[in-house]
Swiss-Prot record:
Coiled-coil ranges per UniProt: none
GO terms assigned for molecular function: N-acylglucosamine-6-phosphate 2-epimerase activity
Functional pathway: Amino-sugar metabolism; N-acetylneuraminate degradation; D-fructose 6-phosphate from N-acetylneuraminate: step 3/5
The protein, known as: Putative N-acetylmannosamine-6-phosphate 2-epimerase
Function according to Swiss-Prot or TrEMBL: Converts N-acetylmannosamine-6-phosphate (ManNAc-6-P) to N-acetylglucosamine-6-phosphate (GlcNAc-6-P).
Stated family: Belongs to the NanE family.
Length: 234
């Protein structure tokens, strides 16, 4: 298992490259109760030249670590109804991820009500206090959320949840305006969410982002096939 990179070292590694999100949830075609599928996705991504992997769950992350030394952005998706945040939504999930020695832990940092009752700045501060050497990424949906997370000391701001909160911009593709605004504010941005084509990724890279995550367009065959099928209907 490689040593955890510093922020500067990781930014060097991610610059100008693609982080591939390798995830499948229960009910999706590539989900398996016994595992074994996401590490194959990660292996394919590495062979293509990916600079990092984003993965969900302790099991998948451990399996991916066994086959690649690429830096991992780790999350744990767990619902806490009636609250909406479900991406590494409490300290319990942070603890589980911190034990894996991964490069980055990503967390929901939207302004929505949380299961733990904390505001996002307080949550970030608690995590940083408990794990001072752990790099952290805020999954946000608006500029203001990104700014709050940045000011609270987060290392990276990801545009992951733009379009997935009712109050954020609803776009069919990536929220380029949000990515650009965060970059102009001097924030280390990891662009993520609805990046469907190499052309979109190139355009986003030219904005000066710290990294780019592509998921569905690479690792969700049902979604990819659906796009081709819908195009023929129009």
């Amino acid at each position: 298992m490689p040593d955890k990179p510093t922020k500067e070292k990781l930014m060097e590694q991610l610059k100008g490259g693609i982080i591939v999100s390798c995830q499948a949830l229960p009910g999706e075609p590539l989900y398996s109760e016994t595992g074994g599928i996401m590490p194959l996705m990660a292996k394919a991504a590495q062979e293509a030249g990916a600079v990092g992997i984003r993965a969900n769950s302790v099991r998948d992350i451990k399996e991916i670590q066994a086959i690649t030394d690429l830096p991992i952005i780790g999350i744990i998706k767990k619902d806490y109804p009636p609250q909406e945040p479900f991406i590494t939504a409490t300290m319990t999930e942070v603890d589980q991820l911190a034990a894996l020695n991964i490069a980055v832990i990503a967390m929901d940092c939207t302004k929505r009500d949380r299961h733990d009752g904390l505001d996002i700045a307080s949550f970030i501060r608690q995590v940083k206090e408990k794990y001072p050497n752990q790099l952290l990424m805020a999954d946000i949906s608006t500029f203001d959320e990104g700014l709050v997370a940045h000011q609270a000391g987060i290392d990276f701001v990801g545009t992951t949840l733009s379009g997935y909160t009712p109050y954020s911009r609803q776009e069919a593709g990536p929220d380029v305006a949000l990515i650009e605004a965060l970059c102009k504010a001097g924030i280390a941005v990891i662009a993520e969410g609805k990046i469907h084509s190499p052309e979109e990724a190139k355009k986003i890279n030219d904005l000066g982002v710290a990294g780019i995550v592509v998921g569905g367009a690479i690792t969700r065959p049902k979604e990819i096939a659906g796009r081709f099928i819908e195009a023929l209907k129009s």
